[in-house]
């Protein structure tokens, strides 16, 4: 069968549609926001492909995978196993890095373990092994007169029960072993858990070291080396101190030795490789004196946290210790000697004073109250681990070099540079090393190449996955899938072009075509014109959003879509419709926010002027430093300035001009709430007005109902059986939890008495079920309610229900709800708004609405700063600040500044090059 045939798809708002998707082709699903694209691609196609695969597994395996519900569809024929690569699942694990997610780091560990040359970290000498006689000499020299145990580490951190091994030890005639650090008789060792890692050390002998015992000691050492493949451990009986000797690798000058070189020595997720100080995280969290202290104030009032109600009990001990040291507590902190300040901060045993920082750190670990922990958290900063300097690995691992580089040196390079290193290494290696490394290097170079091809050459393999954007994470997964070389699979992707500069879109398209050419069907939900034009087949849903969408509007080749009379996408692609360039642009007023000497991450000590009262676009290729400049520096600095927070600001000398604005607001894509209790009506405050209206009805007044009666969050009006949730969660084993509609209120969230109150024949639950468009017509006589609903319509959200639970909203929808909330406020007109890629998830027609909304914010006298790659938005800006020229190390400079016309003329700007064809020819006069 050469196609996937979907019959009667009704998931969410799909209107019983039939769709045919050609196999082994690049297929784009497009249409307005809310038209049902994700419902078709993810909730129907992927969900059914995954469900059928999972159902074929045993019940034991299914309990770990969960079972997906069968989508609302009559039939799907010709379906392949499905893999979804979406934006939502970014990693929250601080141990995940680009290297571990792509699995490239696993290959590197094996390479360093097999080809790496261990060196001494103290003198740089190549390590060599010790013979049994040399080990004997060291033991006699170091432990003379001391009672020691000679141990042979037979098992080191391996999973298993080891019953057979323990029987074997008995046969050899030994009676004692150390299991996981505990000394036991062999016959008394309890059964070991097979899924836990264990360490078993055989006790060869116990004796007091002396010259007379040399022969016995030599025999012990040789036996220990034989049993453990070259290792012997000496444990001092009295102190418990241990020392490991190796037949293999040791520095003759410093005695520094490495056990055996194995892949786990290079794993920061294993106790054998992780830095013992930070446990492989590369960072430590500690209270920063610079954040905690105000040096201008008198010493007794200088500790900021002491001025809050919770910690004012510390004031007396601080004053007391300063007096004991011979100083007046009213002396300004900065005038106290360094030794006195250190005692106040870190304590003194002789004065019986714990110190402010150790005290707060202890309270943070022991405290039950979330409120107090949050208070202390404001003063905690993340710093590189002082021992490994952020490398995550123990010094033994970092001392193993290939071509003069440690594994950390290489994972810290940008991916593009690392690829060059391995290509050169491949040419250099010879003989046995070449044979060992051949396959490993080919695999590493190929996988790094995939990352370069999806426009991620600026990332390093050591970059923490928690700091990646949704778009970056999705493209990393895409590169990983290419590396897996699967065929016959259905890949479903969600807007992979997000976060990509137009320069890199062609690389992404080639990657998608590469997946297709392996023999896979690639289905992409996408709005980017270039990606749509590269598709083999286009499916357009619409014509509108929500209940006005879910129909199949058009499908076929790109040319067929362009000429289709009903296709909105075709109208934009063919030029019949377009987003107009503004007739005139606002001019800078002379007031600026000036960022001076920014050098966080890859920013090259730059100065940036952001003109106030304008619509400003920050542009540049991925990794050029846009988010660092706007979020790590400007937003955090402004937040501390306006709201007195203690955010860790990126490296910058100063920011001037903040006195020209009143506040800063970040409108990001994070959810408007974590629980189903949050919804668009509660978030935009329109629900307050609706509840007031219901409380004003004659029946509600007669019963004495206040607006609180119509809230599903408090006792009184809500259904108590489900506590206003409308559903009850039932825990299932082998299956995911099931949400059952509440029997009592039938999902309406309120009790019967509350639902008896109606307005124009509808009760409060009916209103929450209305879409924004329906509610707008329903409340025609209430201008205050309509004003808030009108703004939701303006940002393109007329299709969402007022009571739609927050977790079901996409990032783009959440961001536009926040925009609507800001627009509905009575504006002062001196606000700085920051937005990161607000066009995410928007069709070209919705982008037009978004631009109108942003222009309205600026017309009110505000400043809107947008990080954006969408050329339709960029061409409508008043001012552009273009960073680059490249990503990563080769980025971080200001490439071009000015109006879109000025930037388009700049020969050094990639943005300018692509912008030219979007601007009217007549506006590009030189």
UniProtKB/Swiss-Prot annotation:
It holds the Pfam family UvrA_inter. GO terms for cellular component: cytoplasm; excinuclease repair complex. Residues 308-568, 588-916 form the ABC transporter domain. Belongs to the ABC transporter superfamily. UvrA family. The UvrABC repair system catalyzes the recognition and processing of DNA lesions. UvrA is an ATPase and a DNA-binding protein. A damage recognition complex composed of 2 UvrA and 2 UvrB subunits scans DNA for abnormalities. When the presence of a lesion has been verified by UvrB, the UvrA molecules dissociate. HAMAP family: UvrA. Forms a heterotetramer with UvrB during the search for lesions. This is UvrABC system protein A. It comes from Aquifex aeolicus (strain VF5). The gene is uvrA.
């Amino acid at each position: 069968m050469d196609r996937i045939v979907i019959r009667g798809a009704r998931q969410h708002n799909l209107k019983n549609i039939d769709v045919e998707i050609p196999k082994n082709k690049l297929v784009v699903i497009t249409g307005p926001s809310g038209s049902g694209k994700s419902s078709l691609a993810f909730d129907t196609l992927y969900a059914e492909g995954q469900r059928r695969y999972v159902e074929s597994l045993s019940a034991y395996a299914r309990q770990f995978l969960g079972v997906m519900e069968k989508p609302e569809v009559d039939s799907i024929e010709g379906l392949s196993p499905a893999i979804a690569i979406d934006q939502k699942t970014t990693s929250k694990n601080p141990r995940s890095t680009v290297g571990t997610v792509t699995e490239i780091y696993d290959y590197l560990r094996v390479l360093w373990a097999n080809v790496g040359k261990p060196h001494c970290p103290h003198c740089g000498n190549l390590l060599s092994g010790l013979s049994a006689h040399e080990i004997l000499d060291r033991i006699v020299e170091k432990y003379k007169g001391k009672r020691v145990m000679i141990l042979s580490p037979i098992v080191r951190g391996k999973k298993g029960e080891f019953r057979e091994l323990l029987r074997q030890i008995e046969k050899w005639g030994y009676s004692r072993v150390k299991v996981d650090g505990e000394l036991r008789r062999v016959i008394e060792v309890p059964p070991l858990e097979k899924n836990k890692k264990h360490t078993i050390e055989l006790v060869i002998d116990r004796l007091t070291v002396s010259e007379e015992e040399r022969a016995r000691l030599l025999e012990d050492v040789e036996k220990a080396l034989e049993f453990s493949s070259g290792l012997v451990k000496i444990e001092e009986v009295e102190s418990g101190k241990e020392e490991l000797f190796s037949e293999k690798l040791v520095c003759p000058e410093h005695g520094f030795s490495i056990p055996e070189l194995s892949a786990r020595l290079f794993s920061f997720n294993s106790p054998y490789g992780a830095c013992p100080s930070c446990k492989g995280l590369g960072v430590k969290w500690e209270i920063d004196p610079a954040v905690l202290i105000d040096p201008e104030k008198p010493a007794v009032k200088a500790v900021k946290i002491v001025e809050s109600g919770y910690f004012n009990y510390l004031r007396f001990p601080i004053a007391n210790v300063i007096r004991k040291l011979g100083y007046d507590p009213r002396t300004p902190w900065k005038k106290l000697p360094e030794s006195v300040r250190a005692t106040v901060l870190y304590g003194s045993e002789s004065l019986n004073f714990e110190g402010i920082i150790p005290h707060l750190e202890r309270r943070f670990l022991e405290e039950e109250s979330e409120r107090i922990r949050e208070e202390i958290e404001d003063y905690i900063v993340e710093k590189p681990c002082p021992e490994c300097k952020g490398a995550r690995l123990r010094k033994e691992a970092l001392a193993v070099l290939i071509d003069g580089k440690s594994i950390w040196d290489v994972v810290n390079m940008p991916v593009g540079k690392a690829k060059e290193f391995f290509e050169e290494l491949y040419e250099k290696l010879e003989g046995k090393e070449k044979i060992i490394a051949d396959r490993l290097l080919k695999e590493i170079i190929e996988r790094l190449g995939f990352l370069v091809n999806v426009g991620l050459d600026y990332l390093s393999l050591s970059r923490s996955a928690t700091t990646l954007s949704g778009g970056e994470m999705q493209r990393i997964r895409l590169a990983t899938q290419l590396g897996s070389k699967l065929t016959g699979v259905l890949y479903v992707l969600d807007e992979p072009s997000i976060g990509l500069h137009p320069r890199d879109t062609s690389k992404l398209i080639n990657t998608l075509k590469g997946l297709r050419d392996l023999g896979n069907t690639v289905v992409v939900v996408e709005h980017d014109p270039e990606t749509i034009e590269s598709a083999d087949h286009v499916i357009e849903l619409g014509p509108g959003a929500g209940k006005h969408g879910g129909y199949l509007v058009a499908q076929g080749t790109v040319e067929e879509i362009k000429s289709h009379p009903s296709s909105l996408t075709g109208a934009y692609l063919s030029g019949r419709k377009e987003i107009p360039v503004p007739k005139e642009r606002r001019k800078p007023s002379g007031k600026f926010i000036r960022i001076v000497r920014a050098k966080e991450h890859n920013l090259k000590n730059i100065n940036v002027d952001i003109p106030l009262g304008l619509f400003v676009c920050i542009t540049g290729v991925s990794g050029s430093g846009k988010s660092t400049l706007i979020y790590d520096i400007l937003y955090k600095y402004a937040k501390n300035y306006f709201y007195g927070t203690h955010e860790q600001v990126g490296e910058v000398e100063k920011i001037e001009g903040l006195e020209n604005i009143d506040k800063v607001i970040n409108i990001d894509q994070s959810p408007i709430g974590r629980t189903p209790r949050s919804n668009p009506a509660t978030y935009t405050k329109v629900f307050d007005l609706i509840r007031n209206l219901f409380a004003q009805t004659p029946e509600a007044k007669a019963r004495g109902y206040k607006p609180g009666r119509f809230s599903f969050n408090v006792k009184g009006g809500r259904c108590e059986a489900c506590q206003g949730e409308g559903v009850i969660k039932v825990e299932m084993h082998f299956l995911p939890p099931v949400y059952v509609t509440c029997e009592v209120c039938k999902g309406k969230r309120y009790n019967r008495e509350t639902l008896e109150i109606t307005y124009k024949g509808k009760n409060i639950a009916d209103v929450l079920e209305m879409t924004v468009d329906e509610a707008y017509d329903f409340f025609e006589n209430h201008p205050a309610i309509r004003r808030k609903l009108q703004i939701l319509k303006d940002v393109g959200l007329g299709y969402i229900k007022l009571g739609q639970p927050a977790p079901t909203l996409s990032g783009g929808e959440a961001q536009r709800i926040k925009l609507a909330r800001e627009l509905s406020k009575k504006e002062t007109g001196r606000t700085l708004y920051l937005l990161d890629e607000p066009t995410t998830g928007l069709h070209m027609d919705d982008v037009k609405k978004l631009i109108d909304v942003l222009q309205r914010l600026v017309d009110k006298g505000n400043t809107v700063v947008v990080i954006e790659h969408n050329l339709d938005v960029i061409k409508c800006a008043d001012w552009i600040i273009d960073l680059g020229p490249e990503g990563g190390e080769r980025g971080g400079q200001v490439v071009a500044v000015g109006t879109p016309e000025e930037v388009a003329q700049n020969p050094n700007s990639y943005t300018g090059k692509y912008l030219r064809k979007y601007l009217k020819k007549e506006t590009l006069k030189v």
